Each structure stands twice: as structure tokens, then as C-alpha cells.
Amino acid sequence: MELVTNFVSGVVLTKHQQQTRMLLLKRADGGYWCQVAGSIEKSESAWQAFLRELYEETQVSPYELYSADYLQQFYNFHSDQIFVAAGFVAYCEPDTQVVLNHEHTDYRWCTLEEALELVPFPNQRKFYQHVWQYFVAQNPALELKLESSTVHFRDIY
């Protein structure tokens, strides 16, 4: 069994009609709902990989990025691998347009309750509840914020 640690995952948040919503994507392979996720390439940091994956999958550019202070873990029985993914939280503007690539067939901006109903895996639900508790119900810890002067969002993709 292999431990895979070159993986990232993140929740994208926005406001819609005064309500916080998160972006869910429907996978082309499998047809299930999920958050943005993907592999870290050799020359990237985890946060760079998340921003690249977010842009590749949706063409969304966030205005703020945080470490979620959360590691998402799961076992893939098909490949007999354990995945450990660094978690991120991205904030984007309310009028953000989503343009899907070939990996997804649909998207939705969901409330937490809607997301918990749509996703198939308990680990996803735990991640979303963590994000809501620490990034929606209260202001996120400033220590978790990746400063835009350091990150240079637009230079990543």
C-alpha cells in the first residue's frame, strides 16, 4: 500500500443573496459531486497546485486564499493507496463565472446543507463542516491566510 501526499483539495466560497455558498463540481468519471482537488506537480508548492487546479478545472481566480488547517485523508481501494491532501479555502467574488474543463459535467453553488446532501463521502462532509465552522461562522485566523503579496495569484496560471 502506498501513501500519496502530493495531493490538494479545497473549498471555494462566495456570497449569493447574502448567503455563503460553496462550489461543488460533478465529476465526469463517476458522476459524483466533489470540491476542487488534484495532484501537486514537481515544481509546485501545495497552495500553487490548488490555485492551478482551481483555474484549470473552473477558470476561477480567488481574491483570498487560506490554508484550511485541515488534512483530508481517504483510502482508494481501486489503487490500494492512502491519500493525504492539504486543504485550502478560497474566496471569490459573488459574480464569479465558472467555466468547466473536461473533468466535470456540472457545477453548483451550494449552501452547506445542500453540499452535505450531494456529496457521497463522509470525509467530504467533515471537511465542509470544518470549513463552515472556521471560515464561515467566524472570521478565519489571519495566520492561515496566504498573503497576496507572496502568492501572486495571477502569476500561477
Model segments located where?
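Nudix hydrolase/Nudix homology domain
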Residues: 31-33, 102-157
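Short connector loops at helix/strand junctions that flank enzyme active sites
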Residues: 5-7, 35, 83-85
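Active-site segment of metal-dependent pyrophosphate-handling enzymes
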Residues: 59-96
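Short secondary-structure boundary/capping segments
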Residues: 2, 25, 80, 98-100
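Conserved Nudix-box catalytic region and its N-terminal flanking loop in Nudix hydrolases
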Residues: 18-60
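Conserved N-terminal beta-strand and adjoining loop/helix that marks the start
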Residues: 1-22
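Conserved hydrophobic/aromatic beta-strand scaffold that supports enzyme active sites
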Residues: 24, 87-89, 109
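Short loop segments at secondary-structure junctions
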Residues: 14-17, 28, 91-96, 112-113
